[in-house]
Amino acid sequence: MVVLVSSGSAIAGKEVLGDVNIEDASKRRQVFSAVGQPRMMRHYYSIFHDYGMRCAQVLATKRDFSPGIHRENMINCYESLLSEGIIPIANEDDAVSVTMSMFSDNDELASLVAELIKADALIILSDTDGLYTGHPEDDESEKLNKVTVDENVEKYVQESGKGEGEGRGGMESKIKIAKGTAAKNITTYIANGKRKNVILDIVAGKPVGTKFTA
């Protein structure tokens, strides 16, 4: 059983609307996300439909993961979808999320979902083949195949900037989330989402990406 956590609604909405007259950045994000979410889901629906698969949209805020009725309702939702063979596609409900209580990024959301459904593994897809000891393009840089939660690998992180509408997470965030999730006995991987068959290779136990364990 698989759950896909995907961002992209804000940038999808920005591509549709272009420049808007809304000065407040938070309100712009809400508008971009509200416009872009159905566009993104239409794209996913078409892809899954081509393979004879069904998918569903599951939007969440941090409140949904707090102990209580909201969390129980979220668990019921995921369990029901998965029992029917439907692939849940999770994303933060950016249109209604309060800025001060937003997820740091979708990596955090993915970690919370993994814990919620008691996942066997969490695969975080990036644009690099995993965590390196330096810049991935440097000849002297080496990929770390396996990392434990007590290793100081944060020192290898390179800074990177992101524009408006793009995802909030970088490698530093991914390491933090990967370690935190692995500490809960959920094996976590950071791998290249552009690599062919990357998920299948990880599931098959091939040395793909960087594996985080407790």
Stretch-by-stretch model annotation:
Residues 1-214:
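C-terminal catalytic "cap/lid" subdomain
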